[in-house]
């Protein structure tokens, strides 16, 4: 596996104004991307830039734009749009690359940069390595007659809404359904309500008033409390929550109970198997609940686990010929409908199943029995990867795995996007799970 100097599991991310997430670095990053794209061609490359709603997006949009134009690349500014929309638009507008300025589910004082290839897919390792090498080279400003040009795309919202609606059958409608949408004050705030209303749903909306600072603040897929309460109070059929950049989706049923990515994978896999739509292997991650694996096995559906991160789920799907995969966090990939994780498209796939089968969300989950699972994040001041190499942590991990052997699983991994170590324990007994988790977390905290 390539060791990256700048890129994490989902692009480049950090605190605004510090390290890599500074205007001067992003200027160089844009210049590096432009130079890589220009290699071996006579025409100017074209790059799309989109962003979520955090206030620092204006600063980084300008920095990227300047770096790209200096390198001789044309730029199309999309403005606030979901990450998967930029993936789609990069492909359909025949751009050479797409860039998203977002830190996903993180608070407003974080930001990041994600890239897409001309096909609307995450960059491969070789392209990332070429960009990293170009960052280290001197800044390039081409001669004036070769500078890039910038324009703003005006019809992006309509294009993406029609793309999303095309992911379900033409006769599909949400008439008669009452939904609560939580858009996290993020990139879906203006698109998701419009789309779901066009399909006929009665809507209650929360998280649709971004001010640049409130993205993911107590709302969205990482804060489902408000969504759950609103579903219960309004008598809605279910709730749908997106994260700040719209590539994740979680739900709540009519009683306000959380329905995570593992649950949604089960709903889709079961229905698609019955309809013949499911191809190849369903892909989860090392964090996917053991109960999901058991339930799919009962249905005769093959299931494999990839490393944590939607890019690794995507890679495993391509290698296994599959079309459905995802993570408990809500990154779902429906590769027969979209090239990357798309919260809106994934939500529509689930709703299409429920409408077709005439089931409520809770009824669609009756065949899935997950084992108790819990994850804690332990802050780590230095490189989080160092945690798993410390002798006392490794010994504690061995002991934890022995404690749940035959009854569950234990995972300890550094986050690819935050300065934390994630510890997950699952076991068929909730007391055993909690005791094992507490002991291991205490050792990691002491080591930190």
UniProtKB/Swiss-Prot annotation:
Signal peptide start and end residues: none
Pfam family, one: PGM_PMM_II
Cellular component terms per the entry's GO annotation: cytosol
Residues annotated as binding Mg(2+): 104, 243, 245, 247
Database matches in Gene3D superfamilies: Alpha-D-Glucose-1,6-Bisphosphate, subunit A, domain 3, Alpha-D-phosphohexomutase, C-terminal domain
Location of the active site: 104
Alphabetical keyword list: Isomerase, Magnesium, Metal-binding, Phosphoprotein
Catalytic activity annotation: alpha-D-glucosamine 1-phosphate = D-glucosamine 6-phosphate
Coiled coil: none
Lineage: superkingdom: Bacteria
Role description: Catalyzes the conversion of glucosamine-6-phosphate to glucosamine-1-phosphate.
Family annotation (NCBIfam families): glmM (TIGR01455), PRK10887.1 (NF008139)
Name assigned to this protein: Phosphoglucosamine mutase
């Amino acid at each position: 596996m390539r060791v990256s100097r700048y890129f994490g599991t989902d692009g480049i991310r950090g605190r605004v104004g510090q390290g890599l997430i500074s205007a001067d670095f992003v200027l160089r990053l844009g210049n590096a991307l432009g130079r890589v794209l220009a290699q071996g061609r006579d025409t100017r490359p074209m790059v799309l830039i989109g962003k979520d709603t955090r206030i620092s997006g204006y600063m980084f949009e300008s920095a990227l734009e300047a770096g790209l134009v200096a390198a001789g690349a044309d730029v199309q500014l999309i403005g606030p749009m979901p990450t998967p929309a930029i993936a789609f638009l990069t492909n359909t507008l025949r751009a050479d690359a797409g860039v998203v300025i977002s830190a996903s589910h993180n608070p407003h004082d974080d930001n990041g940069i994600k890239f897409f290839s001309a096909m609307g897919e995450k960059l491969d390792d070789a392209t990332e390595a070429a960009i990293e090498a170009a960052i280290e080279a001197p800044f390039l400003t081409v001669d004036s007659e070769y500078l890039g040009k910038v324009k703003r795309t005006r019809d992006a919202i309509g294009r993406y809404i029609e793309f999303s609606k095309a992911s379900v059958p033409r006769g599909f409608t949400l008439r008669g359904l009452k939904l609560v949408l939580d858009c996290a004050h993020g990139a879906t705030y203006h698109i998701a309500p419009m789309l779901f209303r066009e399909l006929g749903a009665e809507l209650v909306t929360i998280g649709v008033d971004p001010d640049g600072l409130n993205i993911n603040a107590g709302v969205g897929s990482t804060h489902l409390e408000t969504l759950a309460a609103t579903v219960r109070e309004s008598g809605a059929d279910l709730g749908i929550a997106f994260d700040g950049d719209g590539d994740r989706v979680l739900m709540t049923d009519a009683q306000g109970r959380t329905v995570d990515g593992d649950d949604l994978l089960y709903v889709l896999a079961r229905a698609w198997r019955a309809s013949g739509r499911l191809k190849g292997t369903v892909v989860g991650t090392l964090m996917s609940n053991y109960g999901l694996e058991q339930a799919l096995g009962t249905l005769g559906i093959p299931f494999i686990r990839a490393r944590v991160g939607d890019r690794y789920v995507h890679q495993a799907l391509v290698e296994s010929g599959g079309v459905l995969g995802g993570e408990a966090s809500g990154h779902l990939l429906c590769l027969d409908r979209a090239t990357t994780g798309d919260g809106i498209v994934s939500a529509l796939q689930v709703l299409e199943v429920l409408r077709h089968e005439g089931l409520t969300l809770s009824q669609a989950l009756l065949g899935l029995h997950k084992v108790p699972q819990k994850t804690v994040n332990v802050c780590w001041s230095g490189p989080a990867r160092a945690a798993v190499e410390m002798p006392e942590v490794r010994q504690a991990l061995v002991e934890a795995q022995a404690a749940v052997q035959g009854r569950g699983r234990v995972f300890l991994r550094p986050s690819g996007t935050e300065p934390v170590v994630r510890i997950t324990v699952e076991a068929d007994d909730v007391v055993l799970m909690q005791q094992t988790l507490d002991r291991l977390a205490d050792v990691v905290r002491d080591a930190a």
